[in-house]
Amino acid sequence: MNYDNESTREMVSVSKSRVITYGLSKGADLQAQDIIYNFSRGNYELDGINFKLSYKGSIVPVNMKNVLSESSIYAALAATAVGIYFDLNLVDIAKSLNDFVLPRGRMNLLPGIKNTFVIDDTYNSSPEAALAAIDILSRVKIDDKSSKYAVLGEMLEIGHYTEEGHRLVGSKVFEGNIDYLIAVSEKSRDFVRGAVEAGMAADNVFYFDAPEEAASFLKDRIRTGDLLLVKGSQGAHMEKVVKELMAEPEKAEQLLVRQGKEWL
């Protein structure tokens, strides 16, 4: 059970089954400690998430090189708890987590052109999900000479919350010390307004009508070591940006969302 969730934690005392709790906070039976979000080691290789699995005095390092999201850690902890229940070795579990891969378009870490890195979160978007993704982007360690980009397509189907939600996300980009905001499609103009109103320099904010335009701009602008978060609702088609920026576009059909004929 997720120890970090108050409602779930309350279920522990009434459960008649064997319970293994997991989480990021102290008190969980199985805990992820010393979490580090990285994207490079040595020759600009993918590094992803590093943390330590702690269970009953045993501590084992874990590296999930393909992902960059807190939700991935919770998924790994839940899977580990199941493995522990079936008496699997903690070291073997940690090794298997090295190749953990999320579904396409959900905070997947991809190598980009010019030795850059792309966090592909293009499956869909909402204010809550965008805020969580930007929080991760702000926590990733990059080289001092490199830059972080939030490349955000509009968020659809959020009704009366549309303007406020976009402005809130825009302000989070500034508050998270993200170097540049790239806003794509009409409703994303409120990303721009929110960021600038929060204090972001206008010179660091760019707007484009279409993802193809944003991709063309970024291909010329990005430099070695830069890190880009690309996110947007399905209708924003931000996977088109990722396809232009990924180091191996020939793998787009395998790695990206909406690559079927009905989308292209």
Enumerate the language-model features and the residues they cover:
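A short glycine-threonine-serine/GTX helix/turn-capping micro-motif
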Residues: 62-70
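Hydrophobic alpha-helical transmembrane segments
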Residues: 72-77
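General small-molecule cofactor/ligand-binding pocket signal
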Residues: 20, 63, 206-208
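Extended acidic/charged loop-beta regions that coordinate divalent cations
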Residues: 3-61, 103-106, 110
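ATP-dependent carboxylate-amine ligase
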Residues: 16, 57-58, 69, 81-264
